[in-house]
């Protein structure tokens, strides 16, 4: 049988990994797919680099549209990234009747509804396992492996850059800026790391998982996004003393009135497996009503780890190449006409427990005023830690862990405490999740 012919748009880190793994493991992959899969055309602006990777195994061009226009190409793999030209090329590939594989979480989180609708209309597949958590097969697990379950919540470390930074801040006692420079030197962080450190990348991925888990359209514009740039080494140390680790988590949870969709630094009990995910590794916890809590762990990025997910999608499409469109697994797990209109909850309606760090004047009565404000907003205290002041020191840190409360109440309490003349610096607030 004639091999499935693949056109590759972009042959950087992931593209070269995809070509190399497919070439190296071709016999195994063919036995699993039931048919050969061959990358026969590659588009990259750096044609010399591309030619050095593929040799004479594929035709190299500088114009991506030449790949899409080639009637011999069955599947287009988009590895360019971003929202602009990548969206145009994906839509053109769909219009040309090509299946699409992409690792572009930003594109799908923002434009997924439009892209999936176009794919349904043309009877083609848009596959995106590589868009979330690199080599971890979390999309397939949510869409197929857990299909018997009512998913209750997902909590994931889905950005390796921020997890590396937080791990190093804890282990070496360094502040954020110093560790960011180290991460950039080691290649774990981009020259412009904004999407990573501000939580945007994790929010793109969490948006996609939320849509699949709860059968809703992708709604990135409803996500709450907070990064790690304001975290200090002191907060990580205090959290450890209280039995917690701080991780940047993507969280989505089913509630009676809507869906939580949020990314922010989070205190997690040290005893949880996910609290012990270190360096650039990723992990995703999923809680289903039948299966309970499951954990998926592995490399969230890297050439061959992400290529593993890209090729898994190529194999899936090869297997269903002759299947009727209505016999395929839906893009977002639920049938398109069964997607719910459940809203994303505003952040001030979300219930969390909190870590608060207040830098206060070392005076009598300060603590009583702070606890009185919390009590006035029906916020109860779970634990309290006060740093011993050095002799002659006029200020100290007060650390408070609260029980669950509504975010809106906490916002009002923080504003009231911040106005006290004895509170000497902006109050640090980090949400806490037990992940039971």
Predicted regions and their residues:
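N-terminal glycine-/serine-/threonine-rich beta1-alpha1-beta2 phosphate-ribose binding loop
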Residues: 1-96
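General beta-strand structural signal in soluble alpha/beta enzymes
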Residues: 60-62, 69, 77-78, 101-103, ...
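Rossmann-fold NAD(P)-binding glycine/threonine-rich loop
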Residues: 85-96, 105-143
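A short hydrophobic/small-residue beta-strand
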Residues: 99-101, 381
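Rossmann-like NAD(P)H-binding beta-loop-alpha module
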Residues: 120-201, 208
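Substrate-binding/catalytic subdomain of NAD(P)-dependent oxidoreductase enzymes
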Residues: 178-276, 281-283, 302
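Low-complexity, glycine/alanine/valine/leucine- and proline-rich hydrophobic stretches
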Residues: 264-289, 303-304, 375-393
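A conserved regulatory-domain signal marking ACT and ACT-like small-molecule sensing domains
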Residues: 309, 314, 318-436
